[in-house]
Protein backbone atom coordinates (compact mmCIF):
# COMPACT_ATOMS: atom_id res chain seq x y z
CA UNK A 1 0.00 0.00 0.00
CA UNK A 2 2.91 2.35 0.75
CA UNK A 3 4.19 1.79 -2.78
CA UNK A 4 0.88 2.91 -4.28
CA UNK A 5 0.84 5.99 -2.07
CA UNK A 6 4.31 7.05 -3.21
CA UNK A 7 3.31 6.53 -6.85
CA UNK A 8 0.25 8.67 -6.29
CA UNK A 9 2.34 11.43 -4.69
CA UNK A 10 4.85 11.22 -7.55
CA UNK A 11 2.15 11.58 -10.16
CA UNK A 12 0.67 14.50 -8.23
CA UNK A 13 4.03 16.28 -8.13
CA UNK A 14 4.60 15.64 -11.85
CA UNK A 15 1.17 17.06 -12.64
CA UNK A 16 1.87 20.12 -10.50
CA UNK A 17 5.15 20.63 -12.35
CA UNK A 18 3.46 20.48 -15.74
CA UNK A 19 0.77 22.90 -14.57
CA UNK A 20 3.40 25.26 -13.17
CA UNK A 21 5.34 25.20 -16.46
CA UNK A 22 2.16 25.87 -18.42
CA UNK A 23 1.31 28.86 -16.23
CA UNK A 24 4.85 30.23 -16.51
CA UNK A 25 4.76 29.84 -20.29
CA UNK A 26 1.39 31.61 -20.48
CA UNK A 27 2.73 34.46 -18.36
CA UNK A 28 5.85 34.68 -20.53
CA UNK A 29 3.75 34.87 -23.70
CA UNK A 30 1.57 37.61 -22.18
CA UNK A 31 4.67 39.64 -21.30
CA UNK A 32 6.08 39.18 -24.81
CA UNK A 33 2.78 40.30 -26.34
CA UNK A 34 2.64 43.34 -24.05
CA UNK A 35 6.23 44.30 -24.89
CA UNK A 36 5.54 43.97 -28.61
CA UNK A 37 2.38 46.10 -28.37
CA UNK A 38 4.24 48.77 -26.40
CA UNK A 39 6.98 48.77 -29.02
CA UNK A 40 4.48 49.14 -31.85
CA UNK A 41 2.73 52.03 -30.11
CA UNK A 42 6.08 53.76 -29.54
CA UNK A 43 7.11 53.22 -33.18
CA UNK A 44 3.78 54.55 -34.45
CA UNK A 45 4.14 57.60 -32.19
CA UNK A 46 7.65 58.25 -33.48
CA UNK A 47 6.58 57.96 -37.11
CA UNK A 48 3.60 60.22 -36.43
CA UNK A 49 5.88 62.86 -34.95
CA UNK A 50 8.07 62.62 -38.02
CA UNK A 51 5.12 63.74 -40.15
CA UNK A 52 3.80 60.49 -41.53
CA UNK A 53 0.08 59.95 -42.01
CA UNK A 54 -1.22 57.90 -39.02
CA UNK A 55 -3.34 55.69 -41.30
CA UNK A 56 -0.33 54.83 -43.44
CA UNK A 57 1.71 54.15 -40.31
CA UNK A 58 -0.98 51.80 -39.02
CA UNK A 59 -1.17 49.93 -42.33
CA UNK A 60 2.59 49.53 -42.49
CA UNK A 61 2.98 48.38 -38.87
CA UNK A 62 -0.12 46.21 -38.57
CA UNK A 63 -0.32 45.28 -42.23
CA UNK A 64 -3.20 43.73 -44.10
CA UNK A 65 -3.57 41.77 -47.30
CA UNK A 66 -5.52 44.49 -49.13
CA UNK A 67 -2.87 47.21 -49.04
CA UNK A 68 0.44 45.41 -48.97
CA UNK A 69 2.03 48.08 -51.16
CA UNK A 70 1.53 51.01 -48.76
CA UNK A 71 4.45 53.41 -48.68
CA UNK A 72 5.15 56.12 -46.15
CA UNK A 73 5.17 58.87 -48.74
CA UNK A 74 4.14 62.14 -47.16
CA UNK A 75 7.26 63.03 -45.22
CA UNK A 76 7.56 66.76 -44.63
CA UNK A 77 11.10 68.06 -44.87
CA UNK A 78 10.91 70.98 -42.48
CA UNK A 79 12.86 71.95 -39.37
CA UNK A 80 10.47 70.29 -36.91
CA UNK A 81 10.69 66.97 -38.73
CA UNK A 82 14.47 67.15 -38.94
CA UNK A 83 14.67 67.95 -35.23
CA UNK A 84 12.32 65.08 -34.41
CA UNK A 85 14.42 62.76 -36.57
CA UNK A 86 17.54 63.82 -34.68
CA UNK A 87 15.82 63.15 -31.35
CA UNK A 88 14.69 59.68 -32.38
CA UNK A 89 17.94 58.73 -34.12
CA UNK A 90 20.90 59.64 -31.92
CA UNK A 91 23.17 57.44 -34.05
CA UNK A 92 22.54 59.66 -37.05
CA UNK A 93 23.56 62.67 -34.96
CA UNK A 94 26.94 61.08 -34.35
CA UNK A 95 27.38 60.32 -38.04
CA UNK A 96 26.37 63.84 -39.02
CA UNK A 97 28.85 65.33 -36.53
CA UNK A 98 31.64 63.15 -37.93
CA UNK A 99 30.82 64.16 -41.50
CA UNK A 100 30.68 67.82 -40.49
CA UNK A 101 34.02 67.65 -38.69
CA UNK A 102 35.53 65.84 -41.69
CA UNK A 103 34.22 68.51 -44.05
CA UNK A 104 35.56 71.23 -41.78
CA UNK A 105 38.98 69.62 -41.66
CA UNK A 106 39.27 69.06 -45.42
CA UNK A 107 41.22 71.78 -47.20
CA UNK A 108 40.63 72.33 -50.89
CA UNK A 109 43.65 73.38 -52.92
CA UNK A 110 43.58 74.94 -56.34
CA UNK A 111 46.19 74.29 -59.01
CA UNK A 112 48.58 76.87 -57.55
CA UNK A 113 48.54 75.13 -54.17
CA UNK A 114 46.62 77.82 -52.30
CA UNK A 115 43.97 76.76 -49.85
CA UNK A 116 40.53 78.06 -50.67
CA UNK A 117 39.10 77.17 -47.26
From Swiss-Prot:
Belongs to the lagovirus VP2 protein family. The N-terminus domain points away from the virion surface. Translated by a ribosomal termination-reinitiation process from the bicistronic mRNA coding for VP1 and VP2. It comes from Rabbit hemorrhagic disease virus (strain Rabbit/Germany/FRG/1989) (Ra/LV/RHDV/GH/1989/GE). It comes from the Viruses. The lineage of its organism: Viruses, Riboviria, Orthornavirae, Pisuviricota, Pisoniviricetes. The keyword Transport does not apply. One of its GO terms (cellular component) is viral capsid, decoration. Homooligomer. The portal-like structure consists in 12 copies of VP2. Interacts with capsid protein VP1. InterPro entries: VP2_lagovirus (IPR008558). Its main location: virion. This is Minor capsid protein VP2. It is found in: Virion; Host cytoplasm.
Amino acid sequence: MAFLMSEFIGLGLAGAGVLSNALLRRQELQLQKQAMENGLVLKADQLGRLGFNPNEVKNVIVGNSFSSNVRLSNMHNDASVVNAYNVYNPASNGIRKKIKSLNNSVKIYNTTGESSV
